UniProtKB/Swiss-Prot annotation:
Protein's UniProt name: Leucine--tRNA ligase
GO MF term list: aminoacyl-tRNA deacylase activity; ATP binding; leucine-tRNA ligase activity
A cellular-component GO term for this protein: cytosol
Main location: cytoplasm
Keyword Transmembrane in record: no
Source organism of this protein record: Sinorhizobium fredii (strain NBRC 101917 / NGR234)
Record keywords: Aminoacyl-tRNA synthetase, ATP-binding, Cytoplasm, Ligase, Nucleotide-binding, Protein biosynthesis
A Pfam family assignment: tRNA-synt_1g
Family as reported in the entry's similarity comment: Belongs to the class-I aminoacyl-tRNA synthetase family.
'HIGH' region (motif): residue ranges: 43-53
GO terms classed as biological process: leucyl-tRNA aminoacylation
Catalytic reaction(s) noted: tRNA(Leu) + L-leucine + ATP = L-leucyl-tRNA(Leu) + AMP + diphosphate
Localisation per UniProt entry: Cytoplasm
Amino acid sequence: MATERYNPRDTEPRWQQEWDARKVFETENDDPREKYYVLEMFPYPSGRIHMGHVRNYTMGDVVARYKRARGFNVLHPMGWDAFGMPAENAAMERGVHPAGWTYQNIAAMKAQLKVMGLSLDWSREFATCDPAYYQRQQYLFLDFLEKGLVYRRQSKVNWDPVDNTVLANEQVIDGRGWRSGALVEQRELTQWFFRITDFSQDLLDALDGLEQWPEKVRLMQKNWIGRSEGLALRWALDPATVPGETKELTVYTTRPDTLFGASFLAISADHPLAREAAAKDAAIDAFCEECRRAGTSLAALETAEKKGIDTGIRARHPFDPEWELPVYVANFVLMDYGTGAIFGCPSGDQRDLDFARKYGLSVVPVVMPKDADAATFTIEDEAYGGDGVMINSRFLDGLSTEEAFEAVASKLEQETLDGAPRAERKVNFRLRDWGISRQRYWGCPIPVIHCEDCGVVPVPKADLPVTLPPDVTFDKPGNPLDRHPTWRHVACPQCGKDARRETDTMDTFVDSSWYYARFTAPWEDKPTDPKAANHWLPVDQYIGGIEHAILHLLYSRFFTRAMKATGHVAMDEPFKGLFTQGMVVHETYSRGEGAQREWVTPAEIRIDEIDGRRRAVLIETGEEVAIGSIEKMSKSKKNVVDPDDIIGSYGADTARFFVLSDSPPDRDVIWSEAGVEGAHRFVQRVWRLVGEAAESLRGAKASPAKEGEGLAISQAAHRTLRAVEADYDKLAFNKAVARIYELVNVLAAPLTQVAAGKADQAVTAAVKDATTILIDLIAPMMPHLAEECWREIGGEGLIAERPWPTFDPALVVENEITLPVQINGKKRADLTIARDADQSAIESAVLALDAVKAALNGASPRKIIVVPQRIVNVVV
C-alpha cells in the first residue's frame, strides 16, 4: 500500500517530463476535432513570475485541460510581451543590453512556468522582440498604410519627461505617466497614427454581441468610445470685439435644449480664435501656454482645477442678437473633441457651475425635475443635469428636455448665418485615433524612410525586417536610434539618394494587439496563415486583468478589423469569451512611521495569536511589527510571496489548488499561509485515501452501483461529476473545489473500508468508479496528483489524455425536491419532500410546518395553491 506522504518534489518533475516526452500539449492545426482556443494574457518578462501569474495561468490551464478531456482540439500557447521601457531602464541602470536582459528574464520565467505543470504548447512560443515576430508586425503596418489606416501628422502629444517618450491619452493617469509617474507635458510632434476612429461606430455596436464578456468591461469600452448626438451650432461674433478676421464660432453641444441657460462660451487654448486673441494680449498668451503644459487626456483635464481667461470677445445668442456672452479660453476644452469650443450652461453642468461661480457669471435654471415648482426651483451648489421640464427658456417653457432638443434643432437648422444653416446635427465620438510613435529604442521599428525628394517612402516588404541595431548606448536620455552613427542613414528605395530611417518605434500595445493571431501559425512567412487564423479565431476564452479593459482589449478589437480589411483574417472580433480574474492580495507588514516606515516581507515575520489578538513579529529578532491593510501584492510594499518558495515547499498542485479554492475567480484572493497549508493537507488526504486502497482497487472493475450499499457512493460521485462539469463550464472554480471536498468526505469511509478488505465486490466496484471520477475531477486543477493516483490504482495511459467521464443520468436524478412556501404571497419557509409527492401529500406536509401553523393560529387556510415542482402558496 502507498502509505508514504505524497512528495511533489519527486512526482511533479516526473510527470512534467512525461508530458513533454509524449508532446501531449502540442496542437496540430489540421486535427479534425472541434477547436477550442484558450489564451491568458501573455506576460512581460520582468524576470520573475508572481502569484497573480500563478492564478491567471492556473485558471487558463484548468480550462485547457478540461476542454481537452471533453474532446476538443485545444490550442493553449504562451509567449512574451517583451518590448518596452523597463528593458531600457535596466540598460541605463545596470549597463546591460535590453536584448540580453530580456532573453535572460524569459529563460528564468519560462523555467518557473514549466514547474507549474501548465499544459502549454511551447512549440508556438515567441517573444515580441524576436525579429521574426516584429518583421510580420512591420508587414501589417505597411498593409495598413497602403489601406489608409495609418497616417502621419503634427499632433499635440503627451510627453513623459522621465521616460522621454510620447504617451497615448489612455496612458496618462491623473496627469502622470502610467509607468514613470512623472507629470506629463504637452509638445507638438509629428506622429504616426492608426485610424481607429474609422471603426468607432462598429466598435461600439459590436459590444452588444460580446455576450461572453463581463458587462463592466463592455460598459467601460462604451464610455471610452463615447458616442454622443448633438448640434454643431454657429454663433455670430460681435466684430467690434474680435482681434482678427473671424466672424463666427462653431460650438458642438449635446444639450441644445439648455441654450437659454448659457452664460459663457469656452474655447481650447489651441483654437484659432484663441491664437488670434493671444497674439494681441500677453496675459491670454501666457494662459494658453500654461494650458499646453498640462496633459491632453480627458482624465488630466477632469482632475485639474478649472481655469479660464476672458478674451474680451463677445458672441451673440442664436435666439437673441442683443444678448451677448463672453468667450473664455478654458483649460478644460479639448481642441480634438467636437469643435474645440463649447457653451457653458452652469445650471445644468457641475463643471460649468463651478466655472461660473469662480468668474462671477450668471446661473439661470432652465431644466427642473418634473415634480418641482418653477417659482421656487433654484440652483445652489449642485447643478441639475437630469431630464425634466424646461423653465426660463421662452418658447421652450413647459416642454420636456427631449421635446426642447428637437424644437431647438429644428428651428436652428432652418435658420441661416451668412447664407449657411446655423446648426447641423452631428454625431461625435470621444475615441481618438491611436498615436503609436514612441521615441525609444526597445520597440518595433516603424518601417518607413524619409527622403528629401520622395517624401515618406515605405520600406519594401522584401527588405523586412528593419532590425534594431545592437550597438547602441544608453548613457544619455532620449532615443539611442537618433544618435546612431550609421543605422539611420539609408538609400531611398525609390530614387536611391541618401535618406534616413524613421527613428520612432511603435507603442508596445501594438505588439500585443495581434499576437493571438500569430499563435495560430507562428511559423508562417506572412503575419498569418488565413486558413489557420480563420480556423482558430476568435479566441474562445481569453483570461486577464480588468486593468486592460480599454487599452489592450480595444486596440485588439481595432487590429482584428484592420487585419480583416487587409485580408489577414476573416472575423471582426478577436475574443469570443473574456474573463477578468481578481488579484492575489496579502496583508502588509511594516515597522516605523512616516518617512521612517520600512516595509517587511511575509517571509521575515511570524504570526502569533495571543488572547484572540494577532501579532506579527520578526522571526530574527522577535520585534513586533505593524499589521497593515490587505493590498495587491507589490514589490514596493514587500507583501509578495515568491511562487518558487511556495512550489518548493508544497508543490505546484497545492499552489494551483489554493489560488482556485479560496474565492470566486473574478474576486481577489487573500493569500494566507493557513489557506495554503489547508490546500496541502487536502492533497495529502486524497493521496493517503487513494494510496491505502490502491492495492484493492487495482484488480477491481469500476462499475457504479444501482442499489444496495454502494448506491449512495455512486450517486454522490455522479452528482458531483455533473455539478463540477457545470462549474468548469462557468469558470466557477471555487464551487468545483467545494464539491470535490464534499465528495472526498463521502468517499473517505468507503475507501478505508476497501483498503481494509471489508467491502464486497459491488461496493468495491462502486468505490473504484467513484475514485476514478474523483481523479478525473481533480486532474484539471491538480494534474500531477491526478496522474500519480491514476497510476497507483492501475489506470492505463495518462490522465492528461483521458476523455472526460460521463455521468449516469439515473444516478443524478434527485428523489427529493425543495419547494418555497409562501403565506399570502410572501416566502415564509421551505419544504423538502419526495419529488413524486401528490398534491394531497404536499398540502399535509405544508400544514405541518411551524411557520404555517403560526400563521393559521388554529384556523383553516382559505386556499392552498400548489404549482407542481415550483412553489406552494398558502392563502390565509
